[in-house]
């Protein structure tokens, strides 16, 4: 693991954006694994600005998103389909036919099969991850098998509580999702993890310095050959 710690979130997100701009310019047709939630938004904002400044192009990029809520139509403002269009895709030159997000409205078994088939046909060059306060990656909650592929998952209460800030009330937060599995995530050539804030410090510590155990899904990253972690000082505060 290569661990980068920054004084401020602004410095962190500039560094992550520079990392992606360099990587995309070196391989313009790469396949990116993307994440949702509040963590990647500043990265996407920096990448949009870089595109507007003609520093990077996404026209030959293929993307796979980690997950989608079950039961939310694409048109729902909090679906990850809508999120990706609003936060990135609508603002850059990406071909939407080359973007892949699990379906939240198909029968879950069909959605899983459709997404896994597309995923298996590609090699993800860089997989972006955020970190749940309970150590989840994607929507792979504690206890998920390290051998898991794309699957339906029940969201942990802590995840529902964390995500409720995006909804009008906690009762509106979906309780199930389809997520890329941990085995799929680990198949990526490179993994980029972003974690900020003191509320993530315990999960960061366990991810990096704790035992590799399915009770802390992100701990599996210790077994990957090429992981780059971007932390602000608050998220890194428990590291020794």
Swiss-Prot record:
Alphabetic keyword roster: Carbohydrate metabolism, Hydrolase
GO molecular function: glucosamine-6-phosphate deaminase activity; identical protein binding
Domain of life according to the entry: Bacteria
E.C. number: 3.5.99.6
Coiled-coil spans in chain: none
Alphabetical GO biological process terms: carbohydrate metabolic process; glucosamine catabolic process; N-acetylglucosamine catabolic process; N-acetylneuraminate catabolic process
Entry's Gene Ontology cellular component terms: cytoplasm
Pathway(s) annotated for this protein in UniProt: Amino-sugar metabolism; N-acetylneuraminate degradation; D-fructose 6-phosphate from N-acetylneuraminate: step 5/5
Catalytic activity: alpha-D-glucosamine 6-phosphate + H2O = beta-D-fructose 6-phosphate + NH4(+)
Active site per the UniProt annotation: 67, 134, 136, 141
Homology family: Belongs to the glucosamine/galactosamine-6-phosphate isomerase family. NagB subfamily.
Role this protein plays: Catalyzes the reversible isomerization-deamination of glucosamine 6-phosphate (GlcN6P) to form fructose 6-phosphate (Fru6P) and ammonium ion.
Protein name (Swiss-Prot/TrEMBL): Glucosamine-6-phosphate deaminase
Upper lineage: Bacteria, Bacillati, Mycoplasmatota, Mollicutes, Acholeplasmatales
Name of the encoding gene: nagB
